């Protein structure tokens, strides 16, 4: 078991989540701005 390997894998998962969530967050922010 390698803590650094695990950390790296977790970091990649977080980065993937941010990348996939980015457009959704932008869309929500835009919708909120339009709704005001």
Curated annotation (Swiss-Prot):
Keywords: Amidation, Antibiotic, Antimicrobial, Immunity, Innate immunity, Secreted. GO terms for biological process: antibacterial humoral response; defense response to Gram-positive bacterium; innate immune response. The modification Lysine amide is found at residue 36. The keyword Iron does not apply. Transmembrane segments: none annotated. It is found in: Secreted. Disulfide bonds: none annotated. It comes from the Eukaryota. GO terms for cellular component: extracellular region. Cecropins have lytic and antibacterial activity against several Gram-positive and Gram-negative bacteria. Belongs to the cecropin family. This is Cecropin-D.
């Amino acid at each position: 078991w390698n803590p650094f390997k695990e950390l790296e894998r977790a970091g990649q998962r977080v980065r993937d989540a941010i990348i996939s969530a980015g457009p959704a967050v932008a869309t929500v922010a835009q919708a909120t701005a339009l709704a005001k």
